[in-house]
Amino acid sequence: MHAMCLEAAHRPLVARELPVPEPEADEVLIAVSACAVCRTDLHIVDGELAEPKLPLVPGHEIVGHVVEVGREVENLVPGMRVGVPWLGSTCGACTYCRSGRENLCPSARFTGYHRDGGYAGYTVAKAAYSFEIHGDYSDAEAAPLLCAGLIGHRCLRQAGDARRLGIMGFGAAAHIVAQVARFEGREVHAFTRPGDATAQAFARRLGAVWAGDADTLPPQPLDAVIIFAPVGALVPQALRALAPGGIVVCGGIHMSDIPSFPYSILWGERRIVSVANLTRRDAEEFLALAPRVPVRTDITVLPLAEANLALDRLRAGELSGAAVLDCRASRDAG
C-alpha cells in the first residue's frame, strides 16, 4: 500500500510502499478512504510533541470501511463504515480509566503518534476505539468530525452553559463548534488573526454575531472563550474578554508559553482549563449529535501524495475549515 511517512521531525513526509498491516485479536483492518489533516499532525511533524513512533504514518481523523476483524472483535463487522480518532487505546485499569476519564490514562496510546495512522491505504485500529459513522456525510466530509469535531465537542462541554461564547482561532475545530453552539442557542463571537477578513467572513457565515481581530475586545463580556490557536499570548487576551465567573478553555494539545499577566484579569472567579484528548463517550455523543445539528464540514480535498502541501497550507493559515486527504487510490500497491 502507499503511505506517507514521517521519518524524522522537522522533515517532510516521505512516500513509502508498506505491507498491509494485519489486525491483532482485538483490532480491525480498515481500508482508509479519507483522513483529515489536524494541527496535532503538524505539531508532531514540527517536533513540538516529543517522542513519536518513528518511522510513523501520521493521521488520526480516519474514515474507512472494515475489511477484516480480529477473532475477539464483536462490535464491528466487515463492510461497516467507521471512524478512528486520536485516542487509540488505554489501559482500562487505572484510576482515570475506572472513573470515566480515560483521556487522562498515563498508558494511553494515540493514533498517528504511538500507533500508525491514516495517511495510508490501510490501517489497523483497536475495535473498542473505532466508531461507526452515521449520517449522509461523504467519507471526506466525515473525517474532520473525528478530531476537530470531538475535541471541539469536549471544549464546548467544558464551557458549560455559557451563552456568550468566544472562539479564538477560527479553523477546523472552530467551524464545527460554531455550528453546534448556534444549534444550542449560544451567541458565537469569533476571534481571528488580525486583519484576516476571510476568516471573519467565514465565521459570520456560520452564524457568529461578531467577528474581529484577536487583539481586540468583543462588544460585550463573554461567558466562555475557547482557544484553538496554539498561541499562549491569547490566554491573557481571553481573560480580558471574560465576564466574572467565566472560563477560558485551551483546546490544543500544544501551546506556546503563556506570558505573565496581572492577577486583576483572573480575579472575579475567572478560570483557565485545558482539554486533554477525548473519551469514547465523547465520540459516541458527538457522532450521534453531528447529523442532528446537522454539522457541515468545510473541506479542501487533496490526494494523499500531497500531504506535505496540506501541512504547509495549515502551517501558513491558508485553510478555511479542514484539509482532507483522499486515500482511496493508495490501496493499489502493497
What are these regions (language model features)?
Residues 189, 197, 201-271, 330-333:
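Glycine-rich cofactor phosphate-binding loops and adjacent beta1-alpha1 units
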